[in-house]
Curated annotation (Swiss-Prot):
Gene: sec-61
Entry protein name: Protein transport protein SEC61 subunit alpha
Gene3D superfamilies: SecY subunit domain
Regions that span the bilayer: 34-54, 77-97, 120-140, 147-167, 247-267, 362-382, 416-434, 441-458
Major site of localization recorded for this protein: endoplasmic reticulum
Organism: Neurospora crassa (strain ATCC 24698 / 74-OR23-1A / CBS 708.71 / DSM 1257 / FGSC 987)
Protein transport recorded as keyword: yes
Membrane-protein topology: Multi-pass membrane protein
InterPro entries the UniProt entry points to: SecY/SEC61-alpha (IPR002208), SecY_CS (IPR030659), SecY_dom_sf (IPR023201), Translocon_Sec61/SecY_plug_dom (IPR019561)
Record keywords: Endoplasmic reticulum, Membrane, Protein transport, Translocation, Transmembrane, Transmembrane helix, Transport
Family matches, as Pfam families: Plug_translocon, SecY
Subunit description: Heterotrimeric complex composed of SEC61-alpha, SEC61-beta and SEC61-gamma.
Length: 476
């Protein structure tokens, strides 16, 4: 009699979980574009649809640091964003990668149970997170809202979370391009960047009305100010609002990431089954893609959240103050760290602040580079892309490294892959730091995530066969 596995506990829930059926035939590229566009439209509508029953508040957002990375929008149906999906996915990938759960992803039955377990855990996280948000007073004191509104708020968040899970599954199963997670993150970040560049919203800063969008502000200042030189300077360097230098910095980061995406080490391989058949196995500079910055951002965001919650309740406690002291930014209700451990984990506000506090800048750079390098090296072990995994994949395909026997192939890959992962992770961290210091729109982390995801989508589209000519033209 075989022992009961963890995944077997999921079987009773399979009939009750909604599921997107696997397509019976290959979906044409144009239909994939249509489904991807429809998914995106639903996400955008949900991002703007306010929750019914909330008490509006201009107080500091304790989840501010997580919003962009988690495709979340405060006070809307997309309040939870992709948090339940990404948290569930990372937990199960960690459990499978460290063999804490018994699963063979080569078997269809195990693969389906594994995906169902991920979905079930994401639903549980949605219910738990929604309940915590409502009962901790994020939308107003529960006693003021009443039992009916409290239940309605939780229901709205859980149903919206379920829709997001199904939209992600729709794309993952081949009806669309890529995954819902990547699509929603990139859309959220690009929407933020475009808004900061072209927003027509007028803000009174004490010097008269100014437009929030950097490009709109440039034309407005040139048309309304007599001194054109001063108008240009103001448009390029104005404080507390997006400026042209921020926009140019964003474009520089976009170009740098796309350029570095092309860096790779080509490992020559040959077939052990067909004489004369040769090829190459590419090891990219960004071997783990954007995972290091996502994991680092998730770590920092959660540390910031805990510190902010502790400081709001125990602001006089010495240990809490050593952890982090929070004060409101000038002209906003949003809190930012001004001292303590979390201050050194957060980026300088701008290049001037970086020069004025070199210790903060040095510690932040060291933290970013180290965290991204460590996360990148760790991720290859749990994601099925370690030297041992790659050696097994090559062996299964009947390939060996040119000049190496099967037995020595693992040693050579062990010399190359961890180094590439750590160096690539550090490069991602360095780009994020540079992006933050230059003041790129949408934060350094957000800009990097957007570029790597968009580049990934471009590659997916190219693989579909419709954009091969375009790719060749752009890549030269």
């Amino acid at each position: 009699m075989s022992s009961l596995r963890f995944l077997d506990l999921v079987k009773p829930f399979v009939p009750f979980l909604p599921e997107v059926q696997q397509p019976e035939t290959k979906i044409p590229f144009n239909q994939k574009l249509m489904w991807t566009g429809l998914t995106l439209l639903i996400f955008l509508v949900m991002s703007q649809m306010p929750l019914y029953g909330i008490v509006s508040s201009d107080t500091s957002d304790p989840l501010y640091w997580l919003r962009m990375m988690m495709a979340s929008n405060r006070g809307t149906l997309m309040e939870l964003g992709i948090t339940p999906i990404i948290s569930s996915g990372m937990v199960f990938q960690l459990l499978a990668g460290t063999h804490m759960i018994d699963v063979n992803l080569d078997l269809k039955a195990d693969r389906e149970l594994y995906q169902t377990a991920q979905k079930l855990f994401a639903v549980i996280l949605s219910i738990g997170t929604a309940t915590v948000y409502v009962f901790t007073g994020l939308y107003g004191p529960p006693s003021d809202l009443g039992a009916g509104i409290v239940f309605l708020l939780i229901l709205q968040l859980v149903v919206a979370g379920m829709i997001v899970i199904l939209l992600d599954e729709l794309l993952q199963k081949g009806y669309g391009l890529g995954s819902g997670i990547s699509l929603f993150i990139a859309t959220n970040i690009c929407e933020s960047i475009m808004w900061k560049a072209f927003s027509p919203t007028s803000i009174n800063t004490g010097r008269g009305p100014e437009y929030e969008g950097a490009v709109i502000a440039l034309f407005h200042l040139l048309m309304t100010w007599d001194n054109k030189q001063r108008a240009l300077y103001e448009a390029f360097y104005r404080q507390n609002l997006p400026n042209i230098m921020n926009l140019l910095a964003t474009l520089v980061v976009f170009a740098a990431v796309i350029y570095l995406q092309g860096f790779r080490v080509e490992i020559p391989v040959k077939s052990s089954r067909q004489r004369g058949a040769r090829g190459s196995y590419p090891i990219r500079l960004f071997y783990t893609s954007n995972m290091p910055i996502m994991l680092q951002s998730a770590l920092s965001s959660n540390v910031f959240l805990i510190s902010q919650m502790l400081y709001s309740r125990f602001s006089e406690n010495l240990l809490v103050r050593l952890f982090g002291v929070w004060e409101a930014k000038e002209g906003t209700a949003q809190l930012s760290a001004v001292s303590g451990l979390v201050y050194y984990m957060s980026p300088p506000l701008n290049f001037k602040d970086a020069l004025l506090d070199p210790i903060h800048t040095a510690v932040y750079i060291a933290y970013m580079l180290t965290a991204c390098a460590v996360f990148s090296k760790t991720w290859i072990e749990v994601s099925g892309s370690s030297p041992r995994d790659v050696a097994k994949q090559l062996k299964d395909q009947g390939l060996v490294m040119a000049g190496h026997r099967e037995q020595s192939m693992y040693k050579e890959l062990k010399r190359i892959i961890p180094t590439a992962a750590a160096f690539g992770g550090a490069c991602i961290g360095a780009l994020s730091v540079a992006s933050d210091l230059m003041g790129a729109l949408g934060s350094g982390t957000g800009t990097l995530l957007a570029v790597t995801i968009i580049y990934g989508y471009f590659e997916i589209a190219a693989k579909e066969g419709d954009l091969q000519g375009m790719k060749g033209m752009i890549m030269g």
